[in-house]
A protein has these predicted regions:
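A generic structural signal for tightly packed, nonpolar segments enriched in small/aliphatic residues
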Residues: 3-6, 10-185
């Protein structure tokens, strides 16, 4: 048959073959929701799935574009492959707008390859602003033989997200501490 052409705008055409994994956070959330419903767990669970289509079109984002988040914060796009953090930020804003009462909010994401570089493929990173919840999650992971490693929300790295054009950067400016700046975003 006729050979199809592929358009690849990533560093390596092989990396595109792994992009299905970018839906991992949503898959985890749906799996948890299904498990809780299956056992009739008496919890009030709200599931919010911010989703994106990454197809290329004339409306696609470009590096250095400034877009506005749901709460009208101007965001300068540092890398178009970092769309997940924009989605998560908008989902958190949605939670605030909806005045959803909750004991805590969990989000799951394949946010950066930087966490994988730091911790490898078998040890997920955990970020939290709640020390007690973080300890509980880490301890439960150890019990279930599914460990995680807590990384810091190191506030001084917030300055890497600042831009001179009154926008914040979606990716940070230094290229270091990338997993942390993604979580801070």
């Amino acid at each position: 048959g006729r050979r199809q052409r592929q358009m690849c705008i990533r560093d390596s055409s092989n990396s595109m073959l792994l992009m299905k994994k970018d839906m991992g956070g949503s898959a985890v959330v749906l799996g948890i929701a299904y498990a809780l419903m299956s056992i009739n767990c008496p919890v009030n669970l709200r599931v919010i799935l911010p989703l994106a289509e990454n197809a290329v079109s004339e409306k696609s984002m470009r590096p250095l574009d400034v877009v506005y988040s749901r709460n009208q914060t101007p965001v300068e796009i540092g890398n178009t492959d970092a769309e997940g953090r924009l989605l998560l930020a908008d989902a958190l804003t949605y939670c605030q707008e909806s005045k959803i009462k909750s004991d805590f909010i969990l989000d799951f994401a394949t946010l950066t390859g930087a966490a994988r570089v730091a911790l490898g493929t078998e040890l997920p990173a955990l970020f939290t602003n709640n020390d007690n919840l973080g300890k509980d999650i880490i301890n439960e992971g150890i019990k279930q033989i599914d460990p995680m490693w807590r990384l810091p929300l190191f506030k001084p790295y917030n300055k890497q997200l600042d831009k001179n054009n009154n926008a914040i950067s979606s990716t940070g400016s230094s290229g270091t501490g990338v997993a942390i700046t993604a979580a801070l975003f």
